[in-house]
Amino acid sequence: MEKILIFGHQNPDTDTICSAIAYADLKNKLGFNAEPVRLGQVNGETQYALDYFKQESPRLVETAANEVNGVILVDHNERQQSIKDIEDVQVLEVIDHHRIANFETAEPLYYRAEPVGCTATILNKMYKENNVKIEKEIAGLMLSAIISDSLLFKSPTCTEQDIAAAKELAEIAGVDAEEYGLNMLKAGADLSKKTVEELISLDAKEFTLGSKKVEIAQVNTVDIEDVKKRQPELEAALSKVIAEKNLDLFLLVITDILENDSLALAIGDQASKVEKAFNVTLENNTALLKGVVSRKKQVVPVLTDAIAE
């Protein structure tokens, strides 16, 4: 049987890695030949989950067409967030929980997008729908994905479905979701050894908002000041990326996972749109965003509206 590659977005987060592994597991149990792969380096939070549940990180790839004809996308659909040669392969399926944008195919496909907080929540349903048992280790990874995307159930993206799925998966994995989750998030929030280049690319996504090219990166921390004191270096790194990619705006969202607030650092010609979107005033290119923790639900929609006006 012809092999299929399953992967999430560039600059992978925990949901992207763990959902690729989980969906490949499900597809293989259903008789397919699927391999999970990744499009970037594994972050500290994800590595904690992989180590805890004794799972290998997926293989790193830059292109797919040299290996396979068909691919499955998880946790994304926008082409600029996907593999470099996405135009040269057939997208067979998409399992996602984000907006649909900049996406079209020449052939029909299976597309499943649900307004939940995490791709793994959808996959939990799909295991049940196919009467396939979720193994302990896979359940642990799926739980990790939900905890990550929902910031331990505190994010406004988190739904009752996510909470219910996490409860089921924690039971299968044999862990206390709150205790394990806090340890995992803290592992991801240790930024002390990261270079500024790593910080701004750990969880960065490029968007086309109206006619503007915007990159939004998010980092989690337990102390915003630890990141803010590196602001001169960060601004230089952001400006470099803006020049290289011809961006109109680079927005770095520094999220305090304990206080559930974020600091915005905005660089670029469209930085004033951040002020408009959040009704704040940028001082030295930064502004506190009270209660903002979700890029998907609290940043992208309002920034899209501000840029469109």
Swiss-Prot record:
Binding sites annotated in the UniProt record for Mn(2+) 1: 9, 13, 75
Pfam families given in the database record: DHH, DHHA2
Cellular localisation: Cytoplasm
Recorded superkingdom: Bacteria
MF-aspect GO terms: inorganic diphosphate phosphatase activity; manganese ion binding
Keywords: Cytoplasm, Hydrolase, Manganese, Metal-binding
Official protein name in the record: Probable manganese-dependent inorganic pyrophosphatase
Source organism of the structure: Bacillus velezensis (strain DSM 23117 / BGSC 10A6 / LMG 26770 / FZB42) (Bacillus amyloliquefaciens subsp. plantarum)
Taxonomic path: Bacteria, Bacillati, Bacillota, Bacilli, Bacillales
